[in-house]
Design a protein with these regions (language model features):
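Active-site-proximal beta-strand/loop segments in catalytic clefts of secreted hydrolases
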Residues: 70-72, 101-104, 137-139, 193-195, ...
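Loop/turn elements at helix/coil->beta-strand transitions in domains of secreted/extracellular proteins
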Residues: 63-64, 94-97, 130-133, 139-140, ...
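Short coil/turn segments at secondary-structure boundaries
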Residues: 78-83, 103, 148-150, 204-205, ...
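Fungal intrinsically disordered, low-complexity polar regions
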Residues: 1-25, 33-43, 54-64, 153-178
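N-terminal anchoring/stem segment of glycosyltransferases
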Residues: 16-130
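Eukaryotic short linear interaction motifs
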Residues: 75-77, 99, 107-109, 142-145, ...
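Catalytic core and acceptor-binding pocket of nucleotide-sugar-dependent glycosyltransferases
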Residues: 119, 197-302
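GT-A fold catalytic core of metal-dependent nucleotide-sugar glycosyltransferases
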Residues: 113-192, 198, 203-209, 213
Length: 302
């Protein structure tokens, strides 16, 4: 007997019916693809954040470091020249170069002009792509011991490991996020200090590389610039260091007098106060305090 339509199959599927033999085959063929994608992702993370920079020989004439100071054109001409001469003298002793952009060189919108520090460093990296170190120093500071090179004084791996402050709150006094208990000196790309208020960004060193570019781009994110941080880029830096492990993993905090001695400290602390022979004297706060004059305070040390 013939039917007009094929007989209807039962909609009931036996609970123990064998699955199609194609499914395990497809899983087996796709597994290498998944593993490959995972391996590629892991490699990218390693390349960006964990791998030590491959040693390459820079072109002849490449400076060992760039000293970056951002200049406010509203400062007096004599003050600006004194700051520049201080950096130029230091740079000439060690084969470094200087870079003095103005705060007005970068489009900051409504953000405070102190944000210009970040694009200035990024700009310097573009101008000197093969240079090892970028040393940012605020215009309220002087280099007081020009005999100290960045490498021997701080950045040599064994020296840097001995200086690094480990397992301490990133933002004093009671941040729950602490510095790593151990970092290899050759994997540290960002060096700075703390003061009694938090991270002290007036003097810092960046090692050139893809990570440094990533860090500066992250720090200069429009979201942070538009957010009303009380201390602008300083508080933005504290935020990203504490909550982005890829940045904390490259950061070394060193004792304040190694890189950023203050000439006075209103908190009463003395461990960060400038002593003759220190690398840097920072007249921290002299621009914000109406009762202080940076140029007058610096004059005895120029």
């Amino acid at each position: 007997m013939h039917f007009a339509f094929p007989p209807r199959k039962s909609s009931y599927s036996h609970p123990y019916a064998a699955r199609s033999s194609r499914s395990p085959f497809l899983r087996r063929t796709r597994l290498p693809q998944y593993l490959g994608l995972f391996a590629l992702g892991a490699f990218c993370l390693y390349f960006l954040f964990l791998r030590s920079p491959a040693p390459t020989k820079p072109p002849p004439g490449t400076p060992g470091a760039v000293v970056v100071t951002v200049i406010d054109p509203d400062l007096s001409k004599s003050y600006i020249e004194a700051i520049k001469d201080n950096r130029k003298d230091y740079a000439a002793r060690h084969g470094y170069v200087t870079f003095f952009p103005n705060t007005t060189d970068y489009a900051l919108g409504d953000s405070p002009k102190s944000w210009s520090t970040i694009p200035a460093l990024r700009h310097a990296m573009t101008l000197y792509p093969h240079t090892s170190y970028f040393f940012y120093l605020t215009s309220t500071a002087l280099i007081m011991n020009p005999s100290l090179s960045l490498h021997s004084h701080i950045m040599a791996p064994t020296r840097l490991e001995s200086l690094t402050l480990t397992d301490i709150p990133v933002v004093p006094p009671d941040s729950v996020i602490k510095t790593f208990s151990h970092l290899r000196g050759d994997r540290i790309d960002f060096v700075m200090t703390q003061d009694q208020e938090g991270l002290a960004g007036g003097s810092l060193i960046l090692r050139s590389g893809e990570w440094a570019k990533y860090f500066l781009d992250a720090w200069f994110d429009p979201l942070y610039r538009s957010y009303n941080f009380q201390k602008a880029e300083a508080h933005a830096l504290e935020h990203i260091v504490q909550w982005h492990g890829t940045i904390l993993a490259k950061l070394a905090l060193v004792p304040q007098r190694i890189l950023n001695s203050y000439t006075r400290d209103q908190s009463g602390r003395t461990d960060g106060i400038y002593v003759e022979g220190d690398f840097v004297a920072n007249f921290h706060g002299c621009q914000r305090d109406e009762n202080r004059n940076c140029e007058e305070e610096m004059q005895p040390l120029l």
